[in-house]
Amino acid sequence: MSYYAFEGLIPVVHPTAFVHPSAVLIGDVIVGAGVYIGPLASLRGDYGRLIVQAGANIQDGCIMHGYCDTDTIVGENGHIGHGAILHGCLIGRDALVGMNSVIMDGAVIGEESIVAAMSFVKAGFRGEKRQLLMGTPARAVRNVSDDELHWKRLNTKEYQDLVGRCHVSLHETQPLRQMEENRPRLQGTTDVTPKR
């Protein structure tokens, strides 16, 4: 793992969290219990404080940063998709930010809300609970359905379970020269399928 102190502030990572070895955490970063931080994620707490609350996940290639005297927060069970950028914003409890979305300074994503992939949430946006947000700039198009929230929670549980699986079995290795016969397939821990 790449952890860096900055001006005396050292990242804090709960012992039950998993931070991928290629992720980078700098300075004023606080990672809660059961959090998953994916490969190549960058949490750069050299200006504002970055807080990832219990059970949340920050997936591959995500960036978190913020201005001085601000907190950038991912709430409990927050789900941040691959390549998303969070800058000086608040992601509410149980909310999902889709892949490659950008959430700007002072924006608030409400609890149990979903930001569609590739959306741009403008600075200062104030979302409400359980909204589906999409577009550039993002706008609320409707409420999140019970089925969508259930699907989101199943996906988040997969990442929460992945934390333990990574602690047990993830290690650096050399590649095989060819695929072995009867190569097994990995299985998830929930019955989640892609949302269409």
From Swiss-Prot:
Family to which the UniProt record says this protein belongs:
Belongs to the transferase hexapeptide repeat family.
Q: Which Gene3D superfamilies match?
A: Hexapeptide repeat proteins (2.160.10.10)
Outcome of substituting V168A: In strain: O44:K74
Its annotated function is as follows: Overproduction of CaiE stimulates the activity of CaiB and CaiD.
Metabolic or biological pathway: Amine and polyamine metabolism; carnitine metabolism
Where on the tree of life does the source sit, at the highest rank?
Answer: Bacteria
Q: Which CDD domains match?
A: LbH_paaY_like (cd04745)
Q: Where is this region: Disordered?
A: 174-196
Checking Pfam families in the record gives:
Hexapep (PF00132)
Outcome recorded upon mutating R153Q? In strain: O44:K74
Annotated gene: caiE
Q: Where is the composition biased (Polar residues)?
A: 187-196
Question: What is the name listed in the Swiss-Prot or TrEMBL entry for this protein?
Answer: Carnitine operon protein CaiE
Calcium among keywords:
no
Instruction: Please give the PANTHER family that the UniProt record associates with this protein.
Output: DYNACTIN SUBUNIT P25, GAMMA CARBONIC ANHYDRASE-LIKE 1, MITOCHONDRIAL-RELATED
What GO terms are given for molecular function?
transferase activity
Name the Gene Ontology biological process terms: carnitine metabolic process
**Does this UniProt record's set of keywords contain Ion transport?**
no
Q: Which UniProt keywords apply?
A: Repeat, Transferase
